[in-house]
């Protein structure tokens, strides 16, 4: 693939992340369950808030993976980031479709989330591959944690959303492990705490808007 073709592809990915229209390569988990069977209006609203948070997380993931691929010094690391990024694109599409089924919308602040995450990912990538991969691993660890919390918060009757979140959780564990296996190092605790605090702001805001 030529550099121009690659640039066009990455721009298309960024546009689909921010504006919508992501395409999944894998079937949507939970498709065997009825869309909103047994879920009342209040539960749908709550589930939509949680799935909007998850969608924002995937918007941020796309920005992080794209920016880090740009500055990765190793072709194998670029390939690993590309593979994980495609699975994150599946997550993006699943969450977007589920929000539509729930009669809701993605976050109105997606351009802001994407831009901020791209800048952070670029900075992590410029620090060197081991720190970049460590950042990926820590990010996936924190995402896994909040997905587990969502499985406890989602209505039990919303089997469709729960199936999506559970598969996302499984994938995030694999992505984090792949980053560690590729040479990622543990981040200093202060950085982990800052990441957690920033994540808290994002999840609280995205639940509503």
Swiss-Prot record:
Fe cation 2 binds at residues 88, 140, 172, 175. It comes from the Bacteria. Fe cation 1 binds at residues 58, 88, 91, 172. It is an enzyme of class 1 (oxidoreductase). GO terms for biological process: ubiquinone biosynthetic process. It is a peripheral membrane protein. GO terms for molecular function: 3-demethoxyubiquinol 3-hydroxylase activity; metal ion binding. The keyword Membrane applies. Pathway: Cofactor biosynthesis; ubiquinone biosynthesis. It catalyses: a 5-methoxy-2-methyl-3-(all-trans-polyprenyl)benzene-1,4-diol + AH2 + O2 = a 3-demethylubiquinol + A + H2O. Keywords: Cell membrane, Iron, Membrane, Metal-binding, Monooxygenase, Oxidoreductase, Ubiquinone biosynthesis. GO terms for cellular component: plasma membrane. CDD domains: DMQH. InterPro entries: COQ7_proteobact (IPR047809), Ferritin-like (IPR012347), Ferritin-like_SF (IPR009078), Ubq_synth_Coq7 (IPR011566). Binds 2 iron ions per subunit. Its cofactor is Fe cation. It is found in: Cell membrane. Its EC number is 1.14.99.60. PANTHER family: 5-DEMETHOXYUBIQUINONE HYDROXYLASE, MITOCHONDRIAL (PTHR11237:SF4), COENZYME Q10 BIOSYNTHESIS PROTEIN 7 (PTHR11237). Catalyzes the hydroxylation of 2-nonaprenyl-3-methyl-6-methoxy-1,4-benzoquinol during ubiquinone biosynthesis. NCBIfam families: DMQ_monoox_COQ7. Belongs to the COQ7 family. This is 3-demethoxyubiquinol 3-hydroxylase. It comes from Polynucleobacter necessarius subsp. necessarius (strain STIR1). The lineage of its organism: Bacteria, Pseudomonadati, Pseudomonadota, Betaproteobacteria, Burkholderiales.
């Amino acid at each position: 693939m030529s550099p121009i073709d690659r640039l066009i592809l990455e721009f298309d990915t960024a546009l689909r992340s921010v504006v919508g229209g992501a395409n999944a390569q894998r079937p949507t988990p939970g498709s065997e369950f009825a869309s909103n069977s047994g879920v009342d209006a209040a539960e749908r609203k709550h589930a939509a808030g949680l799935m909007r948070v998850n969608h924002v997380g995937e918007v941020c993931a796309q920005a992080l993976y794209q920016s880090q691929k740009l500055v990765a010094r190793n072709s194998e690391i670029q390939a690993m980031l590309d593979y994980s990024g495609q699975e994150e694109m599946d997550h993006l599409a699943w969450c977007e479709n589920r929000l539509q089924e729930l009669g809701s919308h993605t976050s109105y602040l997606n351009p802001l989330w994407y831009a901020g995450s791209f800048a952070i990912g670029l900075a992590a990538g410029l620090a060197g591959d081991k720190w970049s991969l460590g950042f990926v691993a820590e990010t996936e660890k924190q995402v896994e944690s909040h997905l587990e919390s969502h499985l406890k918060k989602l209505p039990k009757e919303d089997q469709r959303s729960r199936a999506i979140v559970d598969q996302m959780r499984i994938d995030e564990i694999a992505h984090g492990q792949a980053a560690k296996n590729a040479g990622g190092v543990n981040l200093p605790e202060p950085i982990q705490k800052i990441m957690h605090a920033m994540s808290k702001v994002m999840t609280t805001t995205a639940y509503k808007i």
